[in-house]
């Protein structure tokens, strides 16, 4: 609402509410609302991830533990095509003996 007042040669215009003023005054509330929504979304995502992690951990703990199958020699990355037995031999002279 605009009111014009004449006082002699000067014209004074009084703007009660302008569109820009409303935007400036409400911009803080808009930013606060956006921040609140983002915080709520992040909180929900964290809660969902925590529940998923707990569910997967209990599922892993309840599974029967089976030993890993041995890697076939053809798929072993350390083999160069030659069939060498992977045996560990130790010489008793190499083993230190503790004396008291």
UniProtKB/Swiss-Prot annotation:
Biased composition regions of type Polar residues, renumbered to the chain: 77-87
Gene: Ncmap
Principal cellular location given in the protein's record: membrane
Functional summary from the UniProt entry: Plays a role in myelin formation.
GO CC term (a single one): Schmidt-Lanterman incisure
Induction per the UniProt record: Up-regulated in Schwann cells by EGR2 during nerve development and after nerve injury.
Extracellular face residues: 1-28
Keyword Glycoprotein: yes
Keywords: Cell membrane, Glycoprotein, Membrane, Transmembrane, Transmembrane helix
Natural source organism: Rattus norvegicus
Molecular function GO labels: structural constituent of myelin sheath
Modification note: Glycosylated.
GO biological process, any: positive regulation of myelination
Protein name in UniProt: Noncompact myelin-associated protein
InterPro entries: NCMAP
Positions of region (Disordered): 58-100
Subcellular location: Cell membrane
Keyword Transmembrane helix: yes
Membrane topology: Single-pass type I membrane protein
UniProt tissue specificity: Expressed in the peripheral nervous system Schwann cells (at protein level).
